[in-house]
Amino acid sequence: MNRKKGDKGFESPRPYKLTHQVVCINNINFQRKSVVGFVELTIFPTVANLNRIKLNSKQCRIYRVRINDLEAAFIYNDPTLEVCHSESKQRNLNYFSNAYAAAVSAVDPDAGNGELCIKVPSELWKHVDELKVLKIHINFSLDQPKGGLHFVVPSVEGSMAERGAHVFSCGYQNSTRFWFPCVDSYSELCTWKLEFTVDAAMVAVSNGDLVETVYTHDMRKKTFHYMLTIPTAASNISLAIGPFEILVDPYMHEVTHFCLPQLLPLLKHTTSYIHEVFEFYEEILTCRYPYSCFKTVFIDEAYVEVAAYASMSIFSTNLLHSAMIIDETPLTRRCLAQALAQQFFGCFISRMSWSDEWVLKGISGYIYGLWMKKTFGVNEYHHWIKEELDKIVAYELKTGGVLLHPIFGGGKEKDNPASHLHFSIKHPHTLSWEYYTMFQCKAHLVMRLIENRISMEFMLQVFNKLLSLASTASSQKFQSHMWSQMLVSTYGFLKSISNVSGKDIQPLIKQWLDQSGVVKFYGSFAFNRKRNVLELEIKQDYTSPGTQKYVGPLKVTVQELDGSFNHTLQIEENSLKHDIPCHSKSRRNKKKKIPLMNGEEVDMDLSAMEADSPLLWIRIDPDMSVLRKVEFEQADFMWQYELRYERDVVAQQESILALEKFPTPASRLALTDILEQEQCFYRVRMSACFCLAKIANSMVSTWTGPPAMKSLFTRMFCCKTCPNIVKTNNFMSFQSYFLQKTMPVAMALLRDVHNLCPKEVLTFILDLIKYNDNRKNKFSDNYYRAEMIDALANSVTPAVSVNNEVRTLDNLNPDVRLILEEITRFLNMEKLLPSYRHTITVSCLRAIRVLQKNGHVPSDASLFKSYAEYGHFVDIRIAALEAVVDYTKVDRSYEELQWLLNMIQTDPVPYVRHKILNMLTKNPPFTKNMESPLCNEALVDQLWKLMNSGTAHDWRLRCGAVDLYFTLFGLSRPSCLPLPELGLVLNLKEKKAVLNPTIIPEAGVGNQFSSSQDEEEVDMDTVHDSQAFISHHLNMLERPSTPGLSKYRPHHHHHHHEHKKKKKKHKHKHKHKHKHDSKDKDREPFAFSSPASGRSVRSPSLSD
């Protein structure tokens, strides 16, 4: 962006420097969902001829702008409100993505742009030439905001405080412009004064220190005054207002927690742990928490579970739990720890540009991982790393790669570093949400690779150095260059690494930062007895999408009879075969213990081994020091030894996965041994349950004895005297609790020779439910009971229909009747005694959908639609919507698809709207290569309109709509559309115009919006309309002139008049009102309604 290689300092893209901002919201109306207030920005011009100031502001109605108390004219133009002209017949995604990327760049603060352009009054020009301070005062209001601020107003009786009404800021990446005018960039830091006037019964929580709370004379309202003296980006400013209950942390008085009424006991328990997280981070970073206070606010209808802002974090209220809940506790603690890690890197230390985002996400994810290792142990940490690695590998192979450090400009290729994607990665607001999630995942994994290279000690020293520099800078009064120490850049971070460690990590950076893709290894081996050598063959696939070629060191661990040996191979360009000398001679007769990797010595039964080979098992890249997928071939007995005796949980998980392909009595025995071993990591034992079920099904004809796991379960959890009755619940040992609730779910997957669930298993599960007794247990059994319902659902197999008879409740299969009765009983009980997070209702809804899909009960979406309505708990709604999405796909129901699309547009909860798009993308009703009755012109238009103008208030939602459009129709024009008339196409990649019958002019999108300095020539007092501007440029193509920006420039003025002439023809809905004569124009701001007024997005019209 603004950073050339080797460039040290930060150069602002703006011709001024912001030093302080005041935000004052003096009226909040919960009834109307409106906000009124003003902002005041203190700026220092950095160039002499500053006559235009660009700021960010979306959906705010701007009433008046004054600079140093003089009225200033301003223009509001937001091309992202409607990306492509509504008249346009374009329907191909390539065109949209280019236009959208251009629209976002046109208002991108990191390119010095903004939606609001203010003209500096001529009286101040001399003042500006002397680079003296300017104070910009903007009065604004927000009416029923669709993004940025979220109002939750329960429709019950009582005052707003009694109803628990609250409002909070939210959004994806830099979204502060949605609720007040600002420079919405992570690189523009300033100090803040924040004031909020609310009803006396409400509490306003914001960033920084609460300086004072002042009541009005009538005591009906009060104003909260916050000061944030640490320079902070507007994007890290937040707000939450509601009738919160307040808890000062008993261990750390500078920490305060807020929750909605009646939840204080849960808040006390949930946050009782947070001081330990503080202590951990301060200790490893050898640096104090950077702010003077920290606030946690738990709110309803959260945008994301955790949102970190300067000195405060906003959490979902669903994370709160009591001491009786087991499963939620680690999840909530992880959320708290993530939020705190981001306080240091993300809020306190910000980024220079979007291409440096990976550093912040990487460091915060990495130190969060260290916290996890300390809190949950090394096994859990390794399991998490493996899980994250599998996720990123699967995503990159599916989509073609995630690029951590996209550098723009320069060479042709670099301009579009992600041509395999259907969206631009040049800007956070054009990214698919899933891509961004995977981006964060890859960032922390790469940080771990850097740690492997330079050591943890050096890594923490680098972080400490970054924090110390930032800390020194933050305490300085405003000096133009000091605060840039609080911004991290890729260059600065890498330089710091080489200074501290003295190591060259350039190859690693080149491999994982500057290119996308993961590595795919295929390994096999042969033992050469004569030479006593292991001949290892390692192949790579670097031609498939999402892969890259790896050259460098690769660790291989070989467990032999005499111990475990590590070898480092050098993977060269073409080398495939590697000879590794063996240390042990092949097996001797004398009985001897075998030393393992961790120094332990164990007795093994070696009868399964090959007589002339000393090899027990082999592992490639055991430390996961390459982002890779490994497919390794070794004999079944080697996997069995590895599962039993290798102490690394990742190796055990990998062997379990491999053993699915070897359904033999020996595999069965190895898995059963693991299930019985109490020292074994609980997640490995849980995986073993499911693997054992798969193996049992493959061996069904030769299986002897009771169904898999049944006797084991009986021995562990049932009464000695009466084996079919389960003991009273006692969940004191969490390991056995997780095993107890997983085993029945896995057993329900067992099938007999006729591919039905054995009657014995079903009876066993029904007995577990019937005799479940939680009276003496100090923990809740809601998750356990929910898993029992999942087990019932797993036992269901497809219905066999006789003479196409219609299924009714009278002719139900007797087993299915039992299952349905249990589900109904559970659902009714839930209405009387709801479980924590309604886990049981969620499982029941999923089970009913399974019965429908298997043809046991009539397929119908109405039950799910009633549960999906606003007002139900969010987990229930998501489960119900999942079922409706599935029904839409299976039954090809246009009606339900319309119902879902309607919900995406009208549902009050942003998270639910996002989830519906997400579920439709993951389980689409049809895809681009399918013929489907659902695919028609009306649907194309509807989705096009949704992403073009219907989601302008929420970046995440718009990118979700783009993902869905891509899944359904692909990149080019949807196949179900009629062929358009002959048209001229400008092929951007080839840079030539061609005639094409299938596509309407795909004009030079890059030229639609321009952010270059030449724009200053535009007459500010003529209303500047982006849509007209674009349509004019499209018309230019019909003329013989070469499409180049310079050629377009002279037409600026002329296009306004041309547009007026054409207005009737186009039926535009723009209204331009010039209230004042030309004399007054300079002084008075003109009234003007935004280009997109009257369209589907409520746009901020500007008036006096």
Curated annotation (Swiss-Prot):
Record-listed Phosphoserine modification sites: S1090, S1093, S1099, S1101, S1103
Location(s) in or outside the cell: Nucleus
Pfam family, one: TAF2_3rd
A GO CC annotation given for this chain: transcription factor TFTC complex
Major location (coarse): nucleus
Biased composition (Polar residues): 1090-1104
InterPro entries on file: Aminopeptidase_N-like_N_sf, ARM-type_fold, Peptidase_M4/M1_CTD_sf, TAF2
One example of a Gene Ontology biological process annotation: positive regulation of DNA-templated transcription
Keyword GTP-binding: no
The keyword Transcription regulation belongs to this UniProt entry's keyword annotation: yes
Binding partners and assembly: Component of the TFIID basal transcription factor complex, composed of TATA-box-binding protein TBP, and a number of TBP-associated factors (TAFs), including TAF1, TAF2, TAF3, TAF4, TAF5, TAF6, TAF7, TAF8, TAF9, TAF10, TAF11, TAF12 and TAF13. Interacts with TAF2C1. Component of the TFTC-HAT complex.
Function recorded in the entry: The TFIID basal transcription factor complex plays a major role in the initiation of RNA polymerase II (Pol II)-dependent transcription. TFIID recognizes and binds promoters with or without a TATA box via its subunit TBP, a TATA-box-binding protein, and promotes assembly of the pre-initiation complex (PIC). The TFIID complex consists of TBP and TBP-associated factors (TAFs), including TAF1, TAF2, TAF3, TAF4, TAF5, TAF6, TAF7, TAF8, TAF9, TAF10, TAF11, TAF12 and TAF13. TAF2 forms a promoter DNA binding subcomplex of TFIID, together with TAF7 and TAF1.
Recorded family membership: Belongs to the TAF2 family.
Protein name, entry field: Transcription initiation factor TFIID subunit 2
Species: Mus musculus
Encoding gene, per UniProt annotation: Taf2
